Amino acid sequence: MALDTDKIIEELKGASILELNDLVKAIEDEFDVTAAAPVAAAGAADAGAAKSEFDVELTEAGQEKVKVIKAVRDITGLGLKDSKDLVDGAPKNVKEGVSEDEANDIKAKLEEVGATVTLK
């Protein structure tokens, strides 16, 4: 038994919406499948995707503010005044859009001198 796709399509073009709906339900029942769109599955996959860029936020300078200012200056390349302003204005982003490894390195350096850091 050979299927003539063109004939089937022509028959479907002449069917009403109700007839097509019944056909879809019958096919789902007969072959134990669903005609649901895979959009929901794709959305769930995107939600679970690993984050590739991080922002390093200085949440609090801690007790050793001078050491934190020096560390911020080394990390960012900012001048002394800009580094001090950043530390004084905490919570502020020290670096934005960096890789996970770089973000963790920066976090470790800042926590080593007593700062509280959050990765976003």
Curated annotation (Swiss-Prot):
The UniProt family comment states: Belongs to the bacterial ribosomal protein bL12 family.
Q: GO cellular component terms?
A: cytosolic large ribosomal subunit
Q: Which domain of life is it from?
A: Bacteria
* Keywords carried by this UniProt record: Ribonucleoprotein, Ribosomal protein
What's this protein's function?
Forms part of the ribosomal stalk which helps the ribosome interact with GTP-bound translation factors. Is thus essential for accurate translation.
Q: What is this protein called?
A: Large ribosomal subunit protein bL12
Entry keyword Ubl conjugation: no
Q: Which CDD domains match?
A: Ribosomal_L7_L12
Q: Organism source for this protein? A: Lactobacillus helveticus (strain DPC 4571)
Q: Molecular function (GO) terms listed?
A: mRNA binding; structural constituent of ribosome
GO process annotations (BP): translation
What is annotated about its quaternary structure and interactions?
Homodimer. Part of the ribosomal stalk of the 50S ribosomal subunit. Forms a multimeric L10(L12)X complex, where L10 forms an elongated spine to which 2 to 4 L12 dimers bind in a sequential fashion. Binds GTP-bound translation factors.
Taxonomic placement:
Bacteria, Bacillati, Bacillota, Bacilli, Lactobacillales
